[in-house]
Amino acid sequence: MNLRHIFILPALLAAMACSDDSPVTPDTPDTPEGPDITNSVEKLVSIDAGQTFQTIAGFGASDCWSPAFVGKSWTSHRAGITELLFSSEIVGGKPKGIGLSQWRVNLGGGSAAQGEASGIEDKSRRAESYLTDDLTYDWTRCEGQRYFMDRAKELGCNNFVLFSNTPPVQYTYNGKGFSARGGLSNLKPEHYGDFAGYMADVAARYTAEGYHISHISPVNEPQYNWDSGQEGSGWTNDEVAALARELD
């Protein structure tokens, strides 16, 4: 049995009340000081590396929302950013990254192509879709997201989860990537099969390109009443079940 001892030394904290006019001059210099926290405390923690309590299948994160922009436009920094996320390499005793083993990929609803007409004011909360208005696929889209997927696989992360915040705008009641129906789905009843087929087609495309798609998550936070703050849709349990059956 190997025991490792870790000594934890908390950082020193300081508190200061500042005025709105000056970031360095307190409004009330005579304000009583807080408790004295200048004394560090040394604690001993013992870790038994030979005892297993659980098995973690994956350590992951999501590409919502910044990677779509970073991967496409931040060409001078994107390689370093992806290395910080996906690298498991140790150099000089220090990790080059956090070694993510799973990556969630947003199947956007197409509000990015709508621009201001999408009704989503914050452009960073709009997303691209491979589905075009004539219901064909444009596989050159989602360039930034595909860059992150490619780098993830290159650096050793090859478990991808596809997820959707909203059906494609071509299939929704209001033609938008957000819902005006409260807790009900924004997906028109006649398009359940189309939406399921779209997700399956994207998964098949990625699989053919060598990405391991371990899961498809067809709805995201379905009990929230999404508005125009970002892409999103509510879903009832019956609606989720109907979509899952189409996707199966």
Question: Model-flagged regions — what are they?
Answer:
Residues 42-213, 234-241, 245:
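N-terminal catalytic cores of secreted or lumenal carbohydrate-active enzymes
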Residues 19-21:
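Bacterial signal peptide processing site
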Residues 14-17:
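C-terminal motif of bacterial Sec signal peptides marking the signal peptidase cleavage site
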Residues 219-240:
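Polysaccharide-binding and catalytic clefts of secreted carbohydrate-active enzymes
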Residues 1-7:
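Bacterial N-terminal signal peptides that target proteins for export
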Residues 23-46:
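Acidic/polar, low-complexity intrinsically disordered N-terminal segments immediately downstream
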